[in-house]
Amino acid sequence: MTLILAIIPVLLLIVLMAFFKMSGDKSSIISLIVTMLIALFGFAFSVDNLFYSFLYGALKAVSPILIIILMAIFSYNVLLKTEKMEIIKQQFASISTDKSIQVLLLTWGFGGLLEAMAGFGTAVAIPAAILISLGFKPIFSATVSLIANSVATAFGAIGTPVLVLAKETNLDVLQLSTNVVLQLSVLMFLIPLVLLFLTNPKLKALPKNIFLALLVGGVSLVGQYLAARYMGAESPAIIGSILSIIVIVLYGKLTASKEEKARKSTLKTKDILNAWSIYLLILFLIILTSPLFPSLRSTLENNWVTRISLPVNATTVNYTISWLTHAGVLLFLGTFISGLIQGAKVKELFIVLWNTVKQLKKTFITVICLVGLSTIMDTSGMIAVIATALATATGSLYPLFAPVIGCLGTFITGSDTSSNILFGKLQASVAGQIHVSPDWLSAANTVGATGGKIISPQSIAIATSAGNQQGKEGEILKAAIPYALAYVVITGIIVYIFS
């Protein structure tokens, strides 16, 4: 009975969004209320625990998630205000007029780099917004951005998910990182192919799409494997994305038509740098404050810190914000400074920021309710009930379903890192019981979690906010589900065969 009750919030959310086509904010409010009632009466959760669990979830929603979403969309809106987005659009067109190459470059290449550096929604929001400005349909832009924001998530935010997994399981980070890359290897070829096919599904484009997918997937795999094997979790996504960008740009230039090659760009280097100054400065600040510079990061992390302690389940949960290394703050600084460089006035920038807040009000409601829901499911024991039931039911076939648990974690929480916190220990424990390598099975949690990112309601809320498409969450979820299912099935087969 408890298993049925535990599953209800997840099923309800999917049904409301995908089949009743209810907006994200309304779906999440209803699902949150039902989850609270189940926790109170089905899991004997006290009112105090319920209140503090929701408060903890709401705080986690505001920071880092909502602050980062707000600042990511703010950066895009500033580019519109200063009219520098037109220069960025012209530059993408100068690289290639081929829509497939533009989509792959923006979502897999640039989006992968944003995920590697910052994570928490930037890799969905910014590429989707730029694609829309290039003339792509909002639903298409949201869907391809979600699908692309999968593989890189494993090592997002400078490797945070795998670093957390290593800490939770007490396993070697180099071995975990290497296993994650190996389990994702097939997807590194398939995801670029899917992106190319969705952009241009014509049969005559298939040979070109396959060749480019093999090329991009190959450099991603080699780069990520070497980085994971010899450097750890911090750099695989960064190196893989940079190599992908280089290969895609070179391919676009080399395969351009004679007319494209003859057409000279009218853009000056100064104008290009000025237009890109927002993202260049943001990347610079993110790299500067990342674990790549441990002494500086340590100094910044220990200054201007907000700490809040909350009593949940007879223990104390700690909520901490290090403002000087906060990705949202870095996004704001990079955007604000670059906005001034691009000619905007201080007052104009604050008006743009306020308009962005108003634009995202439904997204704020959706994300706060979803993270509150996931936190209540965690602290009341619902998630543990679902995961344990799956592990018990599958027995020796468990490795086939291990990625499903990771996927479930990300679907509920919206975060690969949170999924690893919830289920990392469980995966390692089951591995010992069925005589499978804990390193291999724990890595499968992260790999499954990357697939869950495609259909996470939080990620979908970010994608809809980027294109001002609030209310279309159900449509995007239905479009994304088949790809997420295929993703988890493929990774499950890989994990099972080599376990």
Indicate where each model-derived feature is located:
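Structural signal for alpha-helical transmembrane segments and their membrane-water exit/capping regions
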Residues: 2-3, 13-49, 71-82, 248-257, ...
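Membrane-interfacial loop-to-helix junctions in multi-pass transporters
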Residues: 3, 60-65, 92-106, 134-140, ...
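Short helix-coil transition sites and intra-membrane helix breaks within transmembrane domains
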Residues: 63-65, 76-83, 113-123, 151-159, ...
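Hydrophobic alpha-helical transmembrane segments of multi-pass integral membrane proteins
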Residues: 98-129, 133, 364-377, 394-426
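Alpha-helical transmembrane segments of multi-pass membrane proteins
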Residues: 100-112, 138-151, 172-188, 192, ...
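Membrane-core helix-loop-helix motifs of multi-pass transport proteins
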Residues: 146-251, 461-494
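Flexible interhelical linker loops that connect adjacent transmembrane helices
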Residues: 202-214, 255-274
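Transmembrane helical segments that form the transport core of multi-pass membrane transport proteins
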Residues: 240, 259-406
